[in-house]
From Swiss-Prot:
A Pfam family matched in the record: ATP_bind_3
UniProt protein name: tRNA-cytidine(32) 2-sulfurtransferase
Listed pathway(s): tRNA modification
Gene encoding the protein: ttcA
Subunit details: Homodimer.
Obligatory cofactor(s): Mg(2+); [4Fe-4S] cluster
Superkingdom of the source species: Bacteria
Family label: Belongs to the TtcA family.
Organism (species): Sinorhizobium fredii (strain NBRC 101917 / NGR234)
The reaction(s) this protein catalyses: cytidine(32) in tRNA + S-sulfanyl-L-cysteinyl-[cysteine desulfurase] + AH2 + ATP = 2-thiocytidine(32) in tRNA + L-cysteinyl-[cysteine desulfurase] + A + AMP + diphosphate + H(+)
InterPro entries in UniProt: Rossmann-like_a/b/a_fold, TilS/TtcA_N, tRNA_Cyd_32_2_STrfase, tRNA_thiolation_TtcA_Ctu1
Matches recorded under Gene3D superfamilies: HUPs (3.40.50.620)
Cellular compartment(s): Cytoplasm
EC number(s) stated in the UniProt entry for this protein: 2.8.1.-
C-alpha cells in the first residue's frame, strides 16, 4: 500500500530525529553556528527532508562519487552547501564535496569573504577567477537583461572546473520558486512547457547537473541563511536590474500564494504529474493512431 505524503514526511522526520540522537552537531565547525531554538530545528529538519526527497525521487546519488557544489555567496548556495555537509557528516551522503566559487570580475566583489568562510568550515574548495563581467557588459545591449549570457558563461566555466576536479556532477542551489518561475517564463514568453529539471545530463554526456533544493521554498532558505549568519554577497550585476521577466513571474506567484496559500506546492506537484494525452504535443502522444480503450 502506498503511503500518503504526510506519512512519508513523518517517517523522514523520525529518521532525522534518530540520526540527531546519534550525531553531535557541535563536533563540526559549521554546525557550531547553528541556533538551538525549536523553530530553527524544525526548519532544518524540513529542509533536510526535502533534500533527501529529491535525492530519492530523482536518483541523484546513483553512481555519484564527487560533486562540485556551486557557491555564489547568496543565501541559496550557502544553504545548499550547509545541508549537504549536514547529511555528509551524518553518513547519509557518500559523496565527496568540493565547493566552488566563480569570481566573475564584478567591480567591488569582496574576494576574501568566500575563501575565508569556506576555509573556516573545513570544506574542500576552489576559487576560480574569470572576467565574464566584461564580456557580458560588452555583448549585451544597454537596457537588456544580463541573466541569460551571464548564466551561460558561468555554467560553461563550472563544467570545465568540474571536469578538472574529476567530478561527476555539478550541484546547483535552485529552489522551488526558481523552478516555477522558469516554467511560467517559458509558458508565457517561450510558448512551451518546460522548467529547470532536478537532474539533467549535459550535452556532452559526461556531467550531471543536480538541483537538490527542488522541493525547498525560498522563504525557508532565507530564514535558514539568516539564522546561520552566512556572509551574504549581493549580486550587483543582476540584482541591480529592475523589471526582469523573472521578477514579474516572482511577483505573480507571490500574489497567487498570498490569495490561495499552498498553491506553489500544488503547482510544483503538477510538474511531476504530466498526462501527455491531455496536452497537444504529437511528439509526446500518438494522436494519429488513437483508438478506443478496450472495455472490460
Amino acid at each position: 500500500m502506498e503511503l500518503s505524503r504526510s506519512s512519508q514526511r513523518e517517517m523522514m522526520d523520525v529518521a532525522v530525529d534518530a540520526e540527531d540522537n546519534a550525531f553531535d552537531t557541535g563536533d563540526h565547525r559549521l554546525f557550531a553556528r547553528m541556533p538551538s531554538s525549536v523553530s530553527f530545528n524544525k526548519l532544518r529538519k524540513r529542509l533536510l527532508r526535502q533534500v533527501r526527497q529529491a535525492f530519492d525521487g530523482f536518483g541523484m546519488l546513483k553512481g555519484s562519487k564527487r560533486w562540485l557544489v556551486g557557491v555564489s555567496g547568496g543565501k541559496d548556495s550557502y544553504s545548499l552547501l550547509a545541508l549537504l555537509m549536514d547529511l555528509k557528516w551524518r553518513g547519509l551522503l557518500p559523496v565527496e564535496l568540493i565547493a566552488c566559487n566563480l569570481d566573475q570580475g564584478q567591480p567591488n566583489f569582496p574576494k576574501h569573504i568566500l575563501p575565508d568562510y569556506l576555509a573556516s568550515i573545513g570544506v574542500r574548495h576552489r576559487i576560480e577567477y574569470r572576467d565574464t563581467y566584461s564580456i557580458v557588459k560588452e555583448k549585451v545591449p544597454t537596457g537588456a537583461t544580463y541573466c541569460s549570457l551571464c548564466s551561460r558563461l558561468r555554467r560553461g566555466n563550472l563544467y570545465r572546473i568540474a571536469r578538472e576536479e574529476g567530478c561527476d556532477a555539478l550541484v546547483l542551489g535552485h529552489h522551488r520558486e526558481d523552478i516555477l518561475e522558469t516554467f511560467f517564463m517559458n509558458f508565457f514568453h517561450g510558448g512551451r512547457l518546460a522548467s529547470m529539471p532536478a537532474k539533467l545530463l549535459n550535452d556532452e554526456g559526461d556531467l550531471t547537473v543536480l538541483r537538490p533544493l527542488t522541493y525547498a521554498a525560498e522563504d525557508d532558505l532565507a530564514k535558514f541563511a539568516a539564522a546561520m549568519e552566512f556572509p551574504i554577497i549581493p549580486c550587483d550585476l543582476c540584482g541591480s536590474q529592475d523589471g526582469l521577466e523573472r521578477n514579474a513571474m516572482k511577483a505573480m506567484l507571490a500574489d497567487i500564494e498570498r490569495r490561495m496559500p499552498g498553491r506553489k506546492d500544488t503547482m510544483l506537484r503538477a510538474l511531476g504529474h504530466v498526462n501527455p494525452s491531455h496536452l497537444l504535443d504529437p511528439k509526446l502522444f500518438d494522436f494519429q493512431s488513437l483508438s478506443p480503450e478496450p472495455k472490460e
